[in-house]
Amino acid sequence: MTMEFSNPPDAEIRAILARPSTVAVVGCSDSPARDSLRIAKLLKSRGFRVIPVNPQLEAGALRDVLGEDCYPDLASIPGPVEIVDVFRRPEFVPDIVEDAIAKGARVLWCQLGVIHLEAARRANQAGMTVVMDRCPAIEYARLF
């Protein structure tokens, strides 16, 4: 049985992007050449508090760039996270969803090419808004 998935309507995506909040960028790289860091910097420039999540980076690796420590996982982040932006391969998404649910996140945003229907269903069942296979930079350009 295949699950149908539709991203939220444009008005809802616009509302997510128009209201700066705390976003955890899972899979954030410290390389300026990587999309994950470029998107993290864009979100920061739009007023979001951006928390990098990458177990392979030192805590202070992105402090100068994003103003926040890097954490190995969502559970390690002190305080609430509203949006979880995923820059990991699809097979990692189910575990990220479980961590996001435990953290109380309200939005799961999976980047271009990151699609996992069962994880999206689980996130929706937990009350999360799910955006998949979309990039915030492209959505900003398209909706604002």
What spans do the regions from the language model cover?
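Glycine-rich, highly charged phosphate/nucleotide-binding loops
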Residues: 3-9, 62-79, 85-94
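Short, charged, surface-exposed secondary-structure boundary motifs
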Residues: 61-64, 81-82, 118-121, 139-144
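Rossmann-fold NAD(P) dinucleotide-binding segment
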Residues: 92-111
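A short helix->loop->beta-strand "cap" motif at the edges of active sites that frequently abuts
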Residues: 46-48, 103-108, 126-128
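NAD(P)-binding Rossmann-fold cofactor-contacting core
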Residues: 33-34, 41-63
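Rossmann-fold NAD(P)-binding glycine/threonine-rich loop
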Residues: 112-140
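Short N-terminal or domain-adjacent regulatory/targeting segments
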Residues: 1-19
